């Protein structure tokens, strides 16, 4: 898109490819931190099973009352790249690692092994699972023009459902 826009001398109405990383789960967490935006405690730029397990362990050590965490693929949307992790009763690195094979996946026919393989290729994040009796999931779509003008395209509250309650319906 960028090369074509330059060749034709027209504005690029899309993301410059050099900025694509900001749109990933890891990139978004980093951008939010830099901007001082509150976000769930967690870790980004993870790739391996070991990094996921270490992050889950560190989160539980930081908050012994933590019961669940969410693992998210970097390049996913509509909640389909999210998996819920339930902490085992035993608090040990081995127990936490073993429990990873029991991830509750958003896509019913996928297995934890397939999910973790995708994670190793794509990377992702692990963060504390935020739960409440009443859940909302506001969404906004904005457009930034080539001149830097920001325009709100739409806003809405997303309906969530599916096996993990994280799929946008």
Where are the model-predicted features located?
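Short, well-ordered alpha-helical microsegments
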Residues: 1-2, 52, 135-137
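ATP-dependent carboxylate/phosphate-activation module, predominantly the ATP-grasp catalytic core
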Residues: 91-110, 128, 133, 142-169
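Beta-sheet entry/capping signal
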Residues: 11, 67-70, 81-82, 123-124, ...
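Active-site nucleotide/adenylate-binding loops and adjacent lid/helix of ATP-dependent enzymes
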Residues: 19-123
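ATP-binding N-terminal substructure of ATP-dependent carboxylate-amine bond-forming enzymes
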Residues: 1-23, 30
